[in-house]
Amino acid sequence: MKDVIVIKIGGVAAQKLSTKFIKQMQAWIAAGKKIVVVHGGGLVINQLMKERQLPTRKVKGLRVTAKSDLPIIEQALLGQVGRTLTQELNDSDIESLQLVSHLGKTVSADFIDKDLYGYVGDVTAIQTAYLEQLLAEDIVPVLASLGENSSGDLLNINADYLAAAVASSLQAEKLILMTDIEGVLEDKKVLPQLLTSQVSKKIQTGVIKGGMIPKIESAVQTVLSGVGQVLIGDNLLTGTLIAEG
């Protein structure tokens, strides 16, 4: 869809939206842009797990999720982060709706590797009808990084992967992956642009590592699927632009 911008909010930004962020969203909406927000909630999940003296473990940048962890993750994403983000947007006159009952119907997923990651899913399909309906009504959908498989199991999904899938399914003009760092760093400097052909080598040499790996991988897939631009950074306008080449 022309004029659609998908924004993934993670890290500190997911806990409190800045005035600059709100003003940029308002400016885009005034210019006729349609916006979808996808969010994670890793910091809140970590805190809730710590309070319950439960371990946090990641493999290749993805959170290992036991079935018993799911209520905690659901509480963090739906009960805290998503609810707060939606309230902040609505309080700023940006009409928004948190997807709760519609989330499982919108995001279909399946286990990535149950033995390795537990209840962690990869997106198999995005049902766009409800999202398109909200966008047509100038409402910002707010999606937590959760989905359901064909058996109705709730699965934890990396928010970067989900945002990429949403952007690809809607054929958005832009995907923005917001994080706590300025972009992809090499020698302590932000790379203004990263070509898809350069990514494998950057991972092999350790320039791209940890939680940045799924971000970059999802960005590459999104660019190759036809989405116009993918930006990774700590704000809505600057960072590392992922481009095909």
What are these regions, as identified by a protein language model?
Residues 1-245:
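C-terminal catalytic "cap/lid" subdomain
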